[in-house]
């Protein structure tokens, strides 16, 4: 009897969470037209590309491996860079606290329309103990992986701003592709910058 009651309660919990639009933490409702993408990267098997690929799949985005496809959007990873700077020092002048910064640049290419730039900055700080060099390196590597995962999450979220800008451009040009509208006016298409998207470059700080 008790087992049946527990089963019933679990079933009700599932129905309630499904009915209220419950989503897994960290997931984004990616627009339908961006749920199928090409993913381009100069290092497709590197740790950043793997993190981005994983986040796309977690958000129900299908990654198409056919690079010849020209009818679906492309998420292109332009590049990434890491830097480290000293935040505080000990009395003897040795670094006590460091800050890691991960900068990622990407863009979304919509076939027949425009190119939308994306930018992410992720920050992490950690204490530098000169007596535990090996532990310090291990901690830094863990932080770098967490930063890559967070950057990937932020890139996926920025797909929402791409969708909003695309809808705005389509309405502005009378439901015509941006490139066609610009051609009719005798001008070349220009890339949409961060301010046009209505959202500045994402900068996430977590300590």
Curated annotation (Swiss-Prot):
Q: How does it sit in the membrane?
A: Lipid-anchor
Gene3D superfamilies in alphabetical order = Lipoprotein like domain (3.30.160.150)
Q: Where is this region: Disordered?
A: 168-207
Superkingdom of this entry's organism? Bacteria
GO BP field:
Gram-negative-bacterium-type cell outer membrane assembly; lipopolysaccharide transport
Lipid moiety-binding residues (N-palmitoyl cysteine): 20
Keyword Acetylation assigned to the entry: answer is no
Q: Which UniProt keywords apply?
A: Cell outer membrane, Lipoprotein, Membrane, Palmitate, Signal
RNA-binding found in the keyword field: no
The record's GO molecular-function terms, alphabetically, read: lipopolysaccharide binding
Leader peptide range in chain numbering: 1-19
Subcellular location as annotated: Cell outer membrane
Q: Which GO terms describe its cellular component?
A: cell outer membrane; transporter complex
Coiled-coil residue spans = none
Record field: compositional bias (Polar residues): 182-207
Under InterPro entries, the record lists:
LPS_assembly_LptE
Lipid addition sites, S-diacylglycerol cysteine: 20
Give the family this protein belongs to, as stated in its UniProt record.
Belongs to the LptE lipoprotein family.
Q: Its biological function?
A: Together with LptD, is involved in the assembly of lipopolysaccharide (LPS) at the surface of the outer membrane. Required for the proper assembly of LptD. Binds LPS and may serve as the LPS recognition site at the outer membrane.
Subunit (UniProt): Component of the lipopolysaccharide transport and assembly complex. Interacts with LptD.
Identify this protein by name.
Answer: LPS-assembly lipoprotein LptE
Q: Which organism is it from?
A: Yersinia pestis
Q: Which gene encodes it?
A: lptE
């Amino acid at each position: 009897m008790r087992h049946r009651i527990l089963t019933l309660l679990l079933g009700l919990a599932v129905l309630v969470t499904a009915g209220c639009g419950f989503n897994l933490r960290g997931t984004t409702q990616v627009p339908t037209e961006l749920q199928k993408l090409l993913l381009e990267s100069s290092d497709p098997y590197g740790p950043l590309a793997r993190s981005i690929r994983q986040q796309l799949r977690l958000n129900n985005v299908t990654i198409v491996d056919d690079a010849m496809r020209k009818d679906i959007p492309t998420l292109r990873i332009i590049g990434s860079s890491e830097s480290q700077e000293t935040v505080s020092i000990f009395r003897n002048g040795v670094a006590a606290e460091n800050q890691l910064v991960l900068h990622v640049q990407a863009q979304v290419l919509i076939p027949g329309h425009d190119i939308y730039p994306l930018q992410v900055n992720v920050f992490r700080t950690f204490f530098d103990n000169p007596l535990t060099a090996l532990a310090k390196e291990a901690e830094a590597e863990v932080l770098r992986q967490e930063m890559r995962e967070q950057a990937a999450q932020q890139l996926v979220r920025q797909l929402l701003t791409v969708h909003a800008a695309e809808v705005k451009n389509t309405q502005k040009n009378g439901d015509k592709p941006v490139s066609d509208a610009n051609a009719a006016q005798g001008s070349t298409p220009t890339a949409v910058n961060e301010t046009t998207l209505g959202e500045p470059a994402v900068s996430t700080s977590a300590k």
